[in-house]
Amino acid sequence: MTEFQTLRGMVDLLPMQTQRWQIVENLARHHFHRAGLKEIRTPLLEITELFARGIGEATDVVGKEMYTFLDRGDRSCTLRPEGTASVVRSVVQHGLLNQGPQRLWYGGPMFRYERPQAGRQRQFHQMGVEFFGLPSIHADAELISIAWDLLQDLGLKDLKLELNSLGTFEDRQNYHARLNEWLECNFKLLDKDSQDRIHKNPLRILDTKNQSTQELLKDAPLLTDYLSDLSKERFLCLQEALHKLKIPFDLNHNLVRGLDYYCHTAFEITSSQLGAQATVCGGGRYDRLVKQLGGPDTPSIGWAIGMERLIILLEDSIHKEQFVDVYFINRGELPAIEALSLTRKLRAFNIIVELDHSQANFSKQFKRANRSNAKWAIIMGEDEIAKGEIRLKRLTSSINGDGFDEICFRNSEFNELVHTLKN
């Protein structure tokens, strides 16, 4: 074992892994651009109170999972455990809401002190979308459709959209009273975690993963029975919009999400391939959060995708791209200088070139070239310099069937070389 290792739950992404990540990130950016979204980037570190107030003191995230410390100015700081609170803080701080509705996306690392397992790390990555100032139920439908279409375009087949309505704050207050009464009557039948949550965050009991408690909850009062007529109408309109968009969904009356700021729409996109960590994307509406964090009353909705879980699902379907177009083999002082000059010119034409600086014999350099997964090798030694030639050798089989394995270009035939490398 080497002297220095990554911390538990902190994972290095090595070059062959980052290729897969880049494919996903680039496709996501394309979807976001097509949907008229603008990127926002926020710091990894925020004042702890932002998350305590925004996410909720009684949540597991704030109570158990945050990386929190005092800085040298005795301020309590926290590595962001999720993206929404930071985006809201930024939107309020910089007055973006004065410019009208905002349609934003973000991406980057988040931190939670959880037990690491497949698809869940202590440093993890999310990409998310947030709409501000859009109260329409059709904004909810559009937001869900952006996530659904992205996951479909990535080739995921085993997906399920689960949908619920949490109603208004007043709806939930009425429901809390009835739910607490029922939970107290069944206290001894609940699992230990659920018993601990009764007085802290009873709604989270509905989202338990304990099977015996799940069975018990089938007889619990339903939140949907306590929704106001307006909340029920809103939820029906969302379902109709999703039917119109041909996005299939299941109603899950126990879906409450893990953060306190949600209201009305709550949803998750899951995959059975992920086992216990089934959620790929989750989100909902949070109309009170902006005001709660010092901004104006602003209807808002958003979602986040867990990148690690997404990559697990895509490992077999995302194929390795050609990472290098050309591996440049050279030996000798003058060939090395000429090789560097030619490499710069080729890169200016968006040709990916890896230049060998080893000055090893050609046999060893060819072995490296084959390992590089390059399509071509350029060979430049003293003979090529003397003849004024650039020698090109194919390292992979011909796609168009032209049949040549090796060809020489005169130094004056640079354009022909570029054309060959690009085709």
Curated annotation (Swiss-Prot):
HAMAP family xrefs: His_tRNA_synth
EC number, as in UniProt: 6.1.1.21
UniProt xrefs under SUPFAM superfamilies: Class II aaRS ABD-related (SSF52954), Class II aaRS and biotin synthetases (SSF55681)
Highest taxon above the source species: Bacteria
InterPro entries membership: aa-tRNA-synth_II (IPR006195), aa-tRNA-synth_II/BPL/LPL (IPR045864), Anticodon-bd (IPR004154), Anticodon-bd_dom_sf (IPR036621), His-tRNA-ligase (IPR015807), HisRS-like_core (IPR041715), HisRS/HisZ (IPR004516), HisRS_anticodon (IPR033656)
Matching Pfam families: HGTP_anticodon, tRNA-synt_His
Key words, A-Z: Aminoacyl-tRNA synthetase, ATP-binding, Cytoplasm, Ligase, Nucleotide-binding, Protein biosynthesis
Protein localization: Cytoplasm
Family: Belongs to the class-II aminoacyl-tRNA synthetase family.
Protein source organism: Prochlorococcus marinus (strain MIT 9211)
Protein name, as recorded: Histidine--tRNA ligase
Binding partners and assembly: Homodimer.
